[in-house]
A protein has these predicted regions:
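Cofactor-binding active-site loop characterized by glycine-rich and histidine/acidic residues
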Residues: 18-21, 33-154
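N-terminal hydrophobic or amphipathic helices/low-complexity stretches enriched
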Residues: 1-14
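N-terminal capping segment at the start of a domain
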Residues: 11-27
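Histidine-centered catalytic micro-motifs
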Residues: 30
């Protein structure tokens, strides 16, 4: 468990990562990423039951996170890297041809920590509901978290 000062320090690192990634790629959506930094930092470092060392794509025995607003990948990738899912140095490859870190999260590139591809706004919440129902049916008492965007709100 991290205290508030540690969470603030991680959030500051994540915000720096976001700016570096978007500026280096000359592409991306920094606004949503910057505004959701504290949410994802708190989830991954103080709320969610997750461990990069034991992570599995099926989500059994762990909390799951779905980023419905898929264009906010800079914050998602930075938090995943800072939580230990892949090296922080890989953030430099954001949106480069052939890289795992593209503009929307994808499960095809084998990036650990991502349970659901997203991109079409409005699909993440329904996917998260389905994953939560699956957890309930299989008696997995872990949680599914979803960061919704304007697609679910309109």
């Amino acid at each position: 468990m991290y205290d508030n000062k540690q969470l603030q320090e991680i959030s500051t690192q994540v915000r720096r990562d976001i700016l570096r990634m978007v500026c280096s790629a000359k592409s991306g959506h920094p606004g949503g990423s910057m505004s959701s930094t504290d949410i994802l930092t708190t989830l991954y470092f103080n709320v969610m039951k997750q461990d990069p060392a034991t992570w599995t794509r099926d989500g059994k025995g762990q909390d799951m996170f779905i980023l419905s607003a898929g264009h906010m990948t800079p914050v998602y990738y930075s938090v995943l890297a800072r939580a230990g899912y892949f090296p922080v140095s890989e953030l430099a490859s954001f949106r480069q041809f052939g890289a795992r870190l593209q503009g929307h999260p994808s499960i095809r590139k084998g990036l650990p920590g991502i349970f659901q591809a997203s991109g079409s706004l409005g699909q993440g919440l329904s996917a998260a509901c389905g994953l939560a129902l699956g957890k309930k049916l299989y008696k997995d008492d872990n949680f599914v978290f979803c960061l919704c965007g304007d697609g679910e709100s309109e």
